[in-house]
């Protein structure tokens, strides 16, 4: 049974123009790209409104292999950030593992990353894309994100007014930035414990609407080596994962307030346990771990270090990267080769207020780091008691709630910053796994009656039953492709053919080259002019423009045929092997190498170049 709500429907458009018009139409109706799956239909049917929702069946990517991409990264940012729309990607119909990998690759080309999830929701958050991998049909994160987004019109207007733009220097740094939403409801079963530790009185729920809701901030970028030994910036591919003051999310919640229940001995008692109490759950510890799946990536820097309890501090976690062009664009602009010419400090604001918890950092390997906020002040049930003994008439609940800071059970938001590095020539991919967990513990205390013929008194005792604790973890992961063009460190440029009014060099899925209408958001038309003078394809960084075969991109090498140099004060691009200029037929656009003078009348050797924006922020509105 299909959802009957009004929406557009796109299967395979016969031409790019029709598809592009549909993608950029900006209608408030729901829009489908591909047939909805039964599971996708069921998830969306429960929504009150599908206004501003784009449904994408990942199977469409398989059917369109070799075709022009459905959507560029810049178009995705435009629709989600400027117009307030949301993209729901459904992978559930792709069950074959090799085909699943192909669809993940397509998502990497669109967004820079991919997830091992059946569904991924893409929305906006603080001026960047927010990715929410969904763990199942009934994952509450889906509904929470959808409900958080108000009407399309209001959302779009707000984003246009308050879109968070990075500082000018950072905006010029080639990087891919996004937020990762980690949202997990803690089930009733996970927070249900015995009502009494002394008697069999059944179980009860020790939490009230518990959940883990965190927003991690992720940056993918390249640092080029710059400076002298000792102070030089690293020559490395960088992945930075943070929970800072610009991200963090709602935090980890167990309870809004702490309540307690009482159990009384139901038999005549002279000496023994008279009563026990069960107080709502708090966190014995919070733990956060980040791990790379292979040795391609290693931890370069991580914060916080070990911290004492009752520690309050704010700091800036800075990291210097070597960049090309510095804060200002290189004087040669897009004709400049890739080389480090300045340092740029990328900063994160971190705040610590440990209160009852100490922080322990652990790095069991070069690929893994973990941070634990471990209860240190009043860490045991015994230490929470305000009295040790009393008369038999003084029996009652004795846990001092003033010794339990709210951080122990509600709104806990950590701050941390982890930077991974990979070799500058690293290839393949790495999965980054993030675990966010809380160790839930009820507080059990009891009253023991001591009888000694001539009198009696009671003692208050606390219990540390480790079997009555439970760790709940929210796990997520994302895959990074080390061949992504952002890791070259260069700003992408195009090659525009001067014999036409508006034609640029473009590569197809089989690496064939042709002249097409210029599009500054197209990865197929984007190249990195690297330190060797090669034009490396941003669509596939293993392929380069080769003067020995100008009809098709070739595997990159250091051959002179792949090295190019701009003639001074001109629009002429010279090949270092042939010592001839790149030219093209003014009718067909076919490329060739020609002498500087005496060329046929139908040939132009004028080539222009300008920056493209395949992973930069959208144009201002």
UniProtKB/Swiss-Prot annotation:
Keywords tagged on the record: Cytolysis, Hemolysis, Lectin, Signal, Toxin, Virulence
Molecular-function GO terms, alphabetical: carbohydrate binding; toxin activity
Superkingdom of this protein's organism: Bacteria
Function: Bacterial hemolysins are exotoxins that attack blood cell membranes and cause cell rupture by mechanisms not clearly defined.
Position of the signal peptide: 1-30
GO CC entries: extracellular region
Name of this chain's protein: Hemolysin ahh1
Pfam families noted in UniProt: Hemolysin_N (PF12563), Leukocidin (PF07968)
Gene3D superfamilies: Hemolytic toxin, N-terminal domain, Leukocidin/Hemolysin toxin, cytolysin domain, Leukocidin/Hemolysin toxin, pre-stem domain
InterPro entries from the UniProt entry: Hemolysin_N, Hemolysin_N_sf, Hemolysin_pre-stem_dom_sf, Leukocidin/Hemolysin_toxin, Leukocidin/porin_MspA_sf, Ricin_B-like_lectins, Ricin_B_lectin
GO terms for biological process, alphabetical: cytolysis in another organism
Residue ranges occupied by any Ricin B-type lectin domain in the UniProt entry: 491-610
Family label: Belongs to the HlyA hemolysin family.
């Amino acid at each position: 049974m299909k959802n009957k709500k009004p929406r557009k429907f796109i299967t395979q458009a016969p031409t790019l123009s029709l598809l592009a018009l549909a993608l950029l139409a900006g209608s408030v109706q729901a829009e489908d790209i591909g047939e909805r799956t039964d599971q996708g239909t069921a998830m969306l049917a429960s929504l009150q409104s599908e206004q501003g929702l784009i449904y994408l069946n990942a199977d469409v990517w398989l059917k369109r292999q070799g075709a022009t991409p459905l959507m560029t990264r810049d178009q995705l940012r435009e629709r989600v950030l400027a117009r307030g729309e949301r993209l729901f990607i459904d992978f559930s119909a792709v069950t074959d593992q090799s085909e699943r990998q192909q669809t993940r690759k397509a998502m990497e080309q669109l967004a820079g990353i991919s997830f091992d999830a059946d569904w991924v929701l893409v929305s906006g958050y603080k001026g960047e894309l927010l990715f929410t991998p969904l763990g199942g049909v009934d994952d509450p994160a889906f509904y929470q994100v959808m409900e958080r987004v108000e009407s399309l019109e209001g959302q779009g207007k707000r984003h246009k007014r308050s879109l968070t733009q990075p500082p000018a220097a950072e905006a010029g740094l080639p990087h891919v930035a996004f937020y990762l939403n980690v949202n997990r409801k803690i089930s009733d079963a996970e927070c249900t414990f015995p009502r009494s530790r002394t008697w069999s009185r059944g179980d009860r729920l020790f939490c009230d609407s518990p959940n883990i809701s965190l927003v991690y901030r992720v940056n993918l970028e390249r640092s080029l080596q710059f400076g002298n030994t000792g102070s030089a910036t690293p020559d490395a591919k960088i992945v930075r994962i943070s929970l800072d003051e610009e991200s963090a999310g709602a935090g980890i919640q167990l309870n809004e307030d702490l309540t307690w229940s009482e159990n009384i001995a139901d038999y005549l008692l002279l000496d023994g346990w008279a009563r026990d109490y069960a107080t709502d759950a708090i966190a014995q510890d919070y733990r956060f771990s980040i791990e790379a799946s292979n040795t391609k990536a290693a931890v370069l820097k991580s914060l916080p270090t070990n911290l004492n309890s009752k520690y309050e501090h704010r700091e800036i976690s800075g990291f210097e990267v070597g960049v090309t062009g510095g804060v200002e664009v290189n004087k040669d602009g897009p004709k400049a080769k890739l080389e480090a010419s300045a340092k740029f400090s990328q900063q994160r604001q971190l705040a610590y207020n440990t209160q009852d918890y100490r922080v322990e950092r652990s790095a069991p390997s070069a690929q893994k780091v973990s941070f634990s906020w471990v209860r240190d002040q009043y860490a045991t049930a015994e230490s929470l008691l305000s009295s040790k003994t009393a008369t038999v008439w003084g029996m009652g609940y004795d846990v001092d709630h003033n010794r339990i800071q709210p951080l122990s059970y509600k709104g806990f938001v950590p701050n941390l910053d982890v930077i991974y590095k990979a070799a500058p020539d690293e290839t393949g991919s790495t999965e980054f796994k993030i675990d966010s967990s809380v160790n839930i513990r009820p507080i059990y205390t009891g009253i023991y009656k001591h009888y000694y013929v001539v009198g009696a008194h009671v003692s208050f005792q606390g219990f540390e039953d480790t079997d009555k604790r439970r760790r709940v973890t929210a796990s997520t992961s994302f895959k990074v492709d080390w061949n992504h063009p952002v890791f070259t460190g260069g700003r992408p440029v195009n090659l525009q053919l001067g014999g036409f009014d508006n034609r640029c060099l473009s590569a197809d899925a089989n690496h064939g080259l042709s002249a097409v209408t210029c599009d500054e958001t197209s990865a197929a038309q984007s190249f990195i002019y690297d330190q060797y003078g090669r034009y490396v394809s941003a669509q596939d960084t293993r392929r380069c423009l080769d003067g020995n075969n100008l009809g098709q991109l070739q595997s990159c090498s250091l051959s002179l045929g792949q090295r190019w140099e701009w003639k001074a004060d001109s629009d002429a691009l010279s090949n270092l092997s042939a010592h001839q200029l790149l030219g093209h037929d003014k009718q067909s656009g076919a490329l060739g190498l020609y002498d500087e003078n005496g060329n046929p009348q139908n040939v132009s050797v004028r080539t222009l170049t300008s920056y493209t924006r395949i992973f930069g922020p959208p144009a201002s509105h």
